[in-house]
C-alpha cells in the first residue's frame, strides 16, 4: 500500500511540474510573439519612412535645382511630410520629435525652397536627422 502512495505522490508532483512548465512556456511564447510583432511593426514603419524621406529629398532637389514643379511639387512634399510624421508614431518618441521638427521646418521653408539654398539645406538637414534617428532605432532591434 505504501508503494502505491509513493507512486501517487510522484505522479502528482510530475503532473504539477508539467503544468508549471506548460504555463511558463505559454507565457514565454506569448511574450516573444508580442515582442516580435512589435519589432516587425517598427521595422515596416521604419523602412516606409526611409523610402518617404528619400522621395521627399528628391522632391526638394527637383524643386530647387531642376526648377521642376511637377517632380518637386510642394503638395507632394506636404503629403510625404504628413505621412512621415504619422509613421514616426509607431517607431520611437525620439523619431516622433525629429519628424515634428521636419514638419515644422517644412511648414516654414516650403515656399522658399524653389529660390533659397538655405531653405533647401534646412529641409535636407531635418530629413537627415529623421533618417539618422530611424536608422538608430533599426540598429537597436533584435
Predicted regions and their residues:
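N-terminal positive-inside, membrane-proximal cytosolic segments immediately preceding the first
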Residues: 1-16
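Conserved non-transmembrane functional hotspots
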Residues: 27-142
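Hydrophobic membrane-insertion alpha-helices, especially the h-region
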Residues: 12-29
